[in-house]
Structures are given as structure tokens and as C-alpha cells.
């Protein structure tokens, strides 16, 4: 029973770190990256639709993103949605494609992005710690029910703590790499 709690906690911590990595992909670091548009929803025939479902997105150059809509009539809606998403991007529409040039980041903007990265990192650490707390609670319930001994409880609790430390270190490492990428000029 205790092993199942450990395995479950480990999987949940892994998912929390993976979610954090996906979240960081949306933080732009001066280079064009299609994932910055992942959360942009276009009002397409009355239904909110992700840009990635409406257009082909390519990165022909390091600082340029090209969006080629499958339906040319939706180009204006896509452009409006990008502006409305407030990503700090200025799309230019030539009638067939939308081009987004990524300007070089200012020092101030870089610092703001580092703060965002740190905020996301803290949220990821809290998620990992919540998994640890839930796992420890489950283990205590098992011990109360007599399914594991007090010694087992202590051992499993230490194992969960080791996993927690490992995943928090992973979050710190990912954050450090992203900060380095952002501060690169």
C-alpha cells in the first residue's frame, strides 16, 4: 500500500514539473517561438478556437514568426486575437500571412520576464509540496488503519521527502536555465 502512495506521489510530482516546463515555454526569451501563441484563442465563427488549429505557424528566422491561416478570411480575427492576448507582440498582416517580428528585449523587459519565471517556479514548487503533503496524509491514514507500521510510515515519509527535494531541484534547474536564456543578449 505504501509503495502505491509513493508511486502515485512521484507521478504527480513529475506532472507538476512537466506543467511548469510547458508554462515556461510560453515566456518569450527574445527568440521567436510558436508556443507563445498556445494560449491565444480566436473567435472563429462564434467559438473560441486556438490559433494552432486555424493556421500553420512557422519560424523562418530567429526573430520572426509566420502565421499562415488555412482559411484566408480568418486572418483579421487571428490578428485581433494576438493583439488582444497582450503578449507584447505586433502582428503585421499582408493579406495572406501574418508576420510577427520579435524585437530584441530591453533590459527592463528581461528583468520582468525573470520575475515571471520565478513566480512560475514558486507555483511549481508549491504544487510539488502539496503532492508531498497529500502523500504523507495518505500514509498516515494507512498507518492509522493498521495497514503499515510506524517504522514503515517513517521510511515512506523520508522517501517522499527525497522525491520532493529531487523535483524541487529540477524546478530550480529549469528556472535557472530559462533565466540564463532570457538574460542572454
Swiss-Prot record:
Pfam families hit by this protein: RRF (PF01765)
Keyword tags: Cytoplasm, Protein biosynthesis
GO cellular component terms, A-Z: cytoplasm
CDD domains listed in its UniProt record: RRF
Subcellular location: Cytoplasm
Main location per the UniProt record: cytoplasm
One Gene Ontology molecular-function label: ribosomal large subunit binding
Transmembrane segments: none
One annotated GO biological process: translation
InterPro entries named in the record: Ribosome_recyc_fac (IPR002661), Ribosome_recyc_fac_dom (IPR023584), RRF_sf (IPR036191)
UniProt function note: Responsible for the release of ribosomes from messenger RNA at the termination of protein biosynthesis. May increase the efficiency of translation by recycling ribosomes from one round of translation to another.
NCBIfam families xrefs: frr
Similarity comment: Belongs to the RRF family.
Protein name: Ribosome-recycling factor
Organism taxonomic ancestry: Bacteria, Bacillati, Bacillota, Bacilli, Bacillales
Gene behind this protein: frr
Amino acid at each position: 500500500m505504501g509503495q502505491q502512495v509513493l508511486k502515485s506521489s512521484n507521478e504527480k510530482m513529475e506532472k507538476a514539473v512537466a506543467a511548469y516546463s510547458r508554462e515556461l515555454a510560453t515566456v518569450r526569451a527574445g527568440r521567436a517561438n510558436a508556443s507563445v501563441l498556445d494560449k491565444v484563442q480566436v473567435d472563429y465563427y462564434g467559438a473560441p478556437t486556438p490559433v494552432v488549429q486555424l493556421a500553420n505557424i512557422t519560424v523562418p528566422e530567429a526573430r520572426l514568426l509566420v502565421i499562415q491561416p488555412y482559411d484566408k478570411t480568418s486572418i483579421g480575427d487571428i490578428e485581433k486575437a494576438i493583439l488582444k492576448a497582450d503578449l507584447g507582440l505586433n502582428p503585421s498582416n499582408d493579406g495572406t500571412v501574418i508576420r510577427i517580428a520579435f524585437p530584441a528585449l530591453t533590459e527592463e523587459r528581461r528583468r520582468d520576464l525573470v520575475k515571471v519565471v520565478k513566480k512560475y517556479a514558486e507555483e511549481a514548487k508549491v504544487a510539488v509540496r502539496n503532492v508531498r503533503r497529500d502523500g504523507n496524509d495518505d500514509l498516515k491514514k494507512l498507518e492509522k488503519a493498521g495497514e503499515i507500521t510506524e517504522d514503515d510510515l517513517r521510511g515512506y515519509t523520508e522517501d517522499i521527502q527525497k522525491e520532493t527535494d529531487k523535483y524541487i531541484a529540477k524546478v530550480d534547474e529549469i528556472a535557472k536555465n530559462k533565466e540564463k536564456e532570457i538574460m542572454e543578449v
